[in-house]
Amino acid sequence: MDSQLYYRSRCQLVDLAAKYFIPLRQSYRFKAKEVLFRAQGYGHAKQYRRMHKQVKVLKNYLGRVCRDIERYCANTAFAAEDLMQALCHANRLLSQQKRDKNKLYSLHAPEVECISKGKARKRYEFGVKVSLVTTSKQGWVLAAKALHDNPHDGHTLSESIDAAIKNTGVMPEYGFVDRGYRGHSETRLQVFMSGQRRGVTKSIKRWLKRRSAIEPVIGHMKQSHGLATNRLKGKVGDQINALSAAIGYNFALLLNKLSPT
């Protein structure tokens, strides 16, 4: 992933330099492509030491192009907005370390974050967290909100319940959540977690089994209602996409209920 980012950032800077007639000592247009393919080949063959050497070469190419443009801008006081933004992204890429927080994962969508899934098949996802509140019985989506800066699930529960109350005008009596919500501070309703034993009656136990019914809702919203791929730009676009997916899912559920078959 780093090799692709270094390559694309260098391409972006070279194209902008050509647009504004900024002279470069070398653009590395052909050499960088060759090094990128070599790095990807080594990665596919699991020759990681060789791969990291090629990634370092791509990083050096980006740094040289970046410094050329910065020197030109400093000497001529030139400051185009798109060029400054591309330089900012390039410097952010060059300075970030392996274990840094708030890393840059995408040039066209800088707000993208790395979300740890904790699953063997898919350990990480890249995007923005979305919090969903659904009814336990029929699975209507009551609230959908994009959560930036990758917050802990337990810190988002009160905010999600507030959105559900605002949308429906009804105060829920119980909430059923998974174990990711440990450490929450919600006190307005009784919250039960998956695997909880204390205070769980037979009735609550039956409702707690319904908690997993939200998983296919998330799957349907991702596959059929555009939640998996957001084509709207920026943080506002993330919020609009989450709401649109929830509205689309609710309409599909409503049509299914109204259909005669």
Predicted regions and their residues:
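A short, flexible helix-boundary coil/loop motif
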Residues: 224, 228-229, 253-261
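Short alpha-helical "patches" and their helix-cap loops
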Residues: 143-149, 232-238, 257-261
